[in-house]
Curated annotation (Swiss-Prot):
Its cofactor is [4Fe-4S] cluster. Residues 134-371 form the Radical SAM core domain. GO terms for biological process: tRNA modification. Pfam families: Radical_SAM (PF04055), TRAM_2 (PF18693), UPF0004 (PF00919). [4Fe-4S] cluster 1 binds at C16, C52, C81. This is Ribosomal protein uS12 methylthiotransferase RimO.
Length: 441
């Protein structure tokens, strides 16, 4: 007797690493129920599109992905941030099977079950203990909370994902332990506001191994650092207690890397942005951090052309960049997002000026990046291998997060493996990347 074919689902995941984790959770549940993943839409029984709705450009990309799925398959379920305000999606594609907002895993699964029932009851042994991951096997995103309590004027994330909801520390650590046991070498800690972790739980303790651990940024980072993997902290707001984790970096417990979205430097612009810690003595803190941990790498993002940003404000930002010597920078031209309070601010900046300022900032940052990378020539760096080539392999140092930072290009006299961590001698640097060879051979 022929066995019925397992139902197949194609999946599109758009947006940030937090959304990628949402996709991984949905896929893990589907695989546990016997669904198979199809590589192409036309080879699937239905398609799920996890959308991004933060910027208009992201919404355009999401609508395009939905359109491609409809054209290739016709049976489409939409979820994610753009689904929180479904009117635009419904107007463009009225025949979708379902539209849900972010984190609504059960609603997505219910929609799948209605359109494409599973063949049999769930068998949890169909999936590995660490769940299904969409990243390469050697690194994984570890989401520690949902939502955000901040009300930055340019952002609608709290409207889409709600207020901060932290996971108990023990739960996070158990997931991290499973990932490391499955071969993950690098844990990328993500959330909307990583350093606010545990505020909503009042830093409550939860059991982990033979002890209790508080749901607190420092405590969690310290415990993660004991698992034997690289631990990279991302989306960290510069609250005062962030100073505490610098010591962990100096001790080698977590990677000497902080991803802090400063967004601007001008006090007036920060005030209009309603950014936390807007009046902080940030330059003095950065100097102190580097005194404690000289190997510290700082990554940040900035918005140029925010309403009311003057030539003086922008000059202040460029000067601040020179003094701060931020290692890695991403910059965005301000874009009005429907529902953001910054849309109502006076003195909107023209697109032409935004482009001029973006080009000027990136040119300045390129010089800063090249200067800082040049200091690493002649040093030895640990590098995790992402891609193996016939003559040159590509990896990342402790200073490089996947997808967003630079790379280290290496030659080696012996074969390398993806996920392997090697010691490399740095021989050359350019504006964003390092070049060298595997040491000791």
């Amino acid at each position: 007797m022929n066995q019925a074919a397992a139902p197949k689902v194609s999946f599109v995941s758009l947006g940030c690493p937090k959304a990628l984790v949402d996709s991984e959770r949905i896929i893990t549940r589907l695989r546990a129920e016997g669904y198979e993943l199809a590589r192409k839409h036309d080879g699937a029984d239905l398609v799920i599109v996890n959308t991004c709705g933060f910027l208009d450009s992201a919404k355009k990309e999401s609508l395009g992905a939905i359109g491609e799925a409809m054209a290739a398959n016709g049976k489409v379920i939409v979820t994610g941030c753009m689904g929180a305000e479904p009117e635009q999606i419904e107007a463009a594609y009225p025949n979708l099977l379902s539209i849900t907002g972010p984190q609504q895993y059960e609603s997505v699964l219910d929609a799948v079950h209605r359109a494409l029932p599973p063949l049999h009851n769930p068998h949890l042994d169909l999936v590995p203990a660490q769940g299904i991951k969409l990243t390469p096997r050697h690194y994984a995103y570890l989401k520690i909370s949902e939502g955000c309590n901040n009300r930055c004027s340019f952002c609608i994330i709290p409207k889409l994902r709600g207020d901060l909801v932290s996971r108990p520390a023990g739960e996070v650590l158990r997931e991290a332990e499973k990932l490391v046991k499955a071969g993950v070498k690098e844990l990328l800690v993500v959330s909307q506001d990583t350093s606010a972790y545990g505020v909503d739980l009042k830093y409550a303790e939860s059991p982990w191994q033979d002890r209790n651990v508080r749901a607190r940024f420092y405590d969690l980072a310290k415990e993660l650092g004991e698992l034997g993997a690289w631990v990279r902290l991302q989306y960290v707001y510069p609250y005062p207690h962030v100073d505490e984790v610098i010591g962990l970096m100096a001790q080698g417990k977590v990677l000497p890397y902080l991803d802090i979205p400063f967004q601007h430097a001008s006090p007036e612009v920060l005030k209009q942005m309603k950014r936390p810690a807007a009046q902080d003595k940030t330059l003095a803190r950065i100097k102190q951090w580097r005194e404690i941990c000289p190997e510290l790498t700082l990554r940040s993002t900035f918005i140029v052309g925010f309403p009311g940003e003057t030539d003086s404000d922008f000059a202040y930002l460029l000067d601040w960049l020179e003094q701060a010597e931020i290692d890695r920078v991403g910059a965005f031209k301000y874009e009005a997002v429907r529902g953001a309070t910054s849309n109502a601010l006076p003195d909107q900046v023209s697109d032409e000026v935004k482009t001029e300022r973006w080009n000027a900032l990136m040119a300045r940052q390129q010089k800063i990046s090249a200067r800082r990378l040049k200091r690493k020539v002649g040093t030895r760096q640990q590098v995790i291998i992402d891609e193996v080539g016939p003559t040159v392999s590509k990896g990342r140092s402790k200073a490089d997060a996947p997808q967003i930072d630079g790379s280290v290009y290496l030659t080696s006299r012996r074969p390398l493996r993806v996920g392997e961590i090697v010691t490399a001698k740095i021989e050359r640097a350019d504006a964003y990347d390092l070049h060298g060879s595997v040491a000791g051979f």
